[in-house]
Amino acid sequence: MTDTSTAAAVFDWDSPPPVGGTEHALWLAHWHFQFENPEQLHMLEQLYHDDIVWEVPSRRVIHHGKREVLENYARIFESCAEPKIEPVERYATAQRVFDDLEMTFKLIDSKGFPNHQLPVGTRIAMRVVHNFHIQDGLIIRENGYEIWRPDISW
Protein backbone atom coordinates (compact mmCIF):
# COMPACT_ATOMS: atom_id res chain seq x y z
CA MET A 1 0.00 0.00 0.00
CA THR A 2 1.24 3.51 -0.85
CA ASP A 3 1.60 6.02 1.97
CA THR A 4 -0.35 9.16 1.08
CA SER A 5 -1.08 12.29 3.03
CA THR A 6 -2.94 15.54 2.54
CA ALA A 7 -1.57 18.93 3.54
CA ALA A 8 -3.45 20.11 6.59
CA ALA A 9 -0.48 21.49 8.50
CA VAL A 10 1.18 24.86 8.13
CA PHE A 11 4.71 24.33 6.82
CA ASP A 12 7.58 26.37 8.27
CA TRP A 13 10.17 27.45 5.66
CA ASP A 14 12.94 27.41 8.26
CA SER A 15 12.12 23.90 9.54
CA PRO A 16 11.61 21.53 6.61
CA PRO A 17 10.58 17.96 7.42
CA PRO A 18 13.25 15.27 6.92
CA VAL A 19 14.11 14.56 3.28
CA GLY A 20 12.69 11.31 1.93
CA GLY A 21 9.26 11.38 3.52
CA THR A 22 5.76 12.33 2.46
CA GLU A 23 5.76 15.43 4.67
CA HIS A 24 8.90 16.76 2.96
CA ALA A 25 7.28 16.25 -0.46
CA LEU A 26 4.20 18.17 0.72
CA TRP A 27 6.47 20.88 2.17
CA LEU A 28 8.10 21.30 -1.27
CA ALA A 29 4.71 21.64 -3.01
CA HIS A 30 3.42 24.06 -0.38
CA TRP A 31 6.39 26.40 -0.78
CA HIS A 32 6.39 25.98 -4.56
CA PHE A 33 2.93 27.53 -4.71
CA GLN A 34 3.79 30.17 -2.09
CA PHE A 35 6.78 31.31 -4.19
CA GLU A 36 4.97 31.11 -7.54
CA ASN A 37 4.69 34.89 -7.96
CA PRO A 38 6.89 37.61 -9.51
CA GLU A 39 8.16 38.93 -6.17
CA GLN A 40 9.40 35.56 -4.88
CA LEU A 41 10.49 33.81 -8.06
CA HIS A 42 14.09 33.74 -6.81
CA MET A 43 12.94 31.61 -3.85
CA LEU A 44 11.36 29.04 -6.16
CA GLU A 45 14.82 28.21 -7.49
CA GLN A 46 15.80 26.77 -4.10
CA LEU A 47 13.15 24.05 -4.42
CA TYR A 48 14.32 22.82 -7.83
CA HIS A 49 16.92 20.19 -8.61
CA ASP A 50 19.61 21.39 -11.04
CA ASP A 51 18.20 18.94 -13.61
CA ILE A 52 14.58 20.14 -13.31
CA VAL A 53 12.29 19.36 -16.25
CA TRP A 54 9.06 21.40 -16.53
CA GLU A 55 6.43 20.14 -19.00
CA VAL A 56 2.89 20.91 -20.10
CA PRO A 57 2.08 18.02 -22.47
CA SER A 58 -1.19 19.49 -23.80
CA ARG A 59 0.64 22.55 -25.15
CA ARG A 60 3.77 20.57 -26.13
CA VAL A 61 5.97 22.78 -23.98
CA ILE A 62 9.04 21.52 -22.14
CA HIS A 63 11.82 23.39 -20.32
CA HIS A 64 15.08 22.00 -18.93
CA GLY A 65 17.15 23.45 -16.09
CA LYS A 66 16.47 26.09 -13.46
CA ARG A 67 17.17 29.08 -15.70
CA GLU A 68 14.74 28.02 -18.44
CA VAL A 69 12.03 27.11 -15.94
CA LEU A 70 12.30 30.38 -14.01
CA GLU A 71 12.38 32.46 -17.21
CA ASN A 72 9.24 30.63 -18.30
CA TYR A 73 7.51 31.46 -15.02
CA ALA A 74 8.42 35.14 -15.49
CA ARG A 75 6.72 35.05 -18.92
CA ILE A 76 3.65 33.35 -17.42
CA PHE A 77 3.31 36.13 -14.83
CA GLU A 78 3.54 38.75 -17.61
CA SER A 79 0.80 36.97 -19.56
CA CYS A 80 -1.80 36.85 -16.75
CA ALA A 81 -3.94 39.64 -15.37
CA GLU A 82 -6.06 39.27 -12.25
CA PRO A 83 -4.92 35.72 -11.41
CA LYS A 84 -6.83 33.83 -8.74
CA ILE A 85 -6.09 30.30 -7.54
CA GLU A 86 -8.48 28.01 -5.72
CA PRO A 87 -6.93 24.79 -4.40
CA VAL A 88 -8.99 21.62 -4.89
CA GLU A 89 -6.83 18.90 -3.33
CA ARG A 90 -3.24 17.84 -2.76
CA TYR A 91 -1.80 14.47 -1.83
CA ALA A 92 1.61 12.88 -1.87
CA THR A 93 3.98 9.98 -1.50
CA ALA A 94 7.66 10.48 -0.71
CA GLN A 95 8.52 10.76 -4.44
CA ARG A 96 5.39 12.41 -5.89
CA VAL A 97 2.98 15.22 -5.13
CA PHE A 98 -0.28 15.67 -7.01
CA ASP A 99 -1.94 19.05 -6.74
CA ASP A 100 -5.31 19.88 -8.28
CA LEU A 101 -6.38 23.52 -8.56
CA GLU A 102 -8.62 25.99 -10.40
CA MET A 103 -6.95 29.10 -11.79
CA THR A 104 -8.79 32.05 -13.28
CA PHE A 105 -7.08 34.91 -15.10
CA LYS A 106 -7.28 37.16 -18.13
CA LEU A 107 -4.85 36.12 -20.87
CA ILE A 108 -3.15 39.38 -21.90
CA ASP A 109 -0.45 37.99 -24.21
CA SER A 110 0.92 34.69 -25.52
CA LYS A 111 4.52 34.81 -24.21
CA GLY A 112 3.88 32.67 -21.13
CA PHE A 113 1.49 30.24 -22.76
CA PRO A 114 2.82 29.11 -26.14
CA ASN A 115 0.36 26.94 -28.07
CA HIS A 116 -2.55 28.11 -25.88
CA GLN A 117 -6.06 27.22 -26.96
CA LEU A 118 -8.04 30.43 -26.46
CA PRO A 119 -7.60 33.94 -27.88
CA VAL A 120 -5.61 36.64 -26.10
CA GLY A 121 -8.05 38.83 -24.18
CA THR A 122 -10.13 35.86 -23.00
CA ARG A 123 -10.90 35.40 -19.32
CA ILE A 124 -9.73 31.85 -18.59
CA ALA A 125 -10.93 29.24 -16.10
CA MET A 126 -8.15 26.66 -16.12
CA ARG A 127 -8.12 23.40 -14.21
CA VAL A 128 -4.51 22.37 -13.55
CA VAL A 129 -3.18 19.17 -12.04
CA HIS A 130 0.50 19.31 -11.14
CA ASN A 131 2.56 16.14 -10.82
CA PHE A 132 5.78 16.91 -8.97
CA HIS A 133 8.56 14.31 -9.02
CA ILE A 134 10.85 14.50 -5.99
CA GLN A 135 14.50 13.42 -5.97
CA ASP A 136 17.24 14.18 -3.43
CA GLY A 137 14.79 16.34 -1.49
CA LEU A 138 14.09 18.66 -4.46
CA ILE A 139 11.63 18.92 -7.33
CA ILE A 140 13.25 17.28 -10.35
CA ARG A 141 10.20 17.25 -12.62
CA GLU A 142 7.02 19.31 -12.76
CA ASN A 143 4.28 18.22 -15.14
CA GLY A 144 1.24 20.46 -15.50
CA TYR A 145 -1.93 19.02 -17.01
CA GLU A 146 -4.13 21.93 -18.13
CA ILE A 147 -7.78 22.11 -19.14
CA TRP A 148 -8.47 25.49 -20.75
CA ARG A 149 -12.02 26.90 -20.68
CA PRO A 150 -13.48 30.37 -21.09
CA ASP A 151 -14.46 31.73 -17.68
CA ILE A 152 -18.21 32.23 -17.88
CA SER A 153 -18.49 33.49 -14.28
CA TRP A 154 -17.09 36.99 -15.06
Named regions from a protein language model:
Residues 2-154:
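C-terminal and inter-domain tail/linker signature
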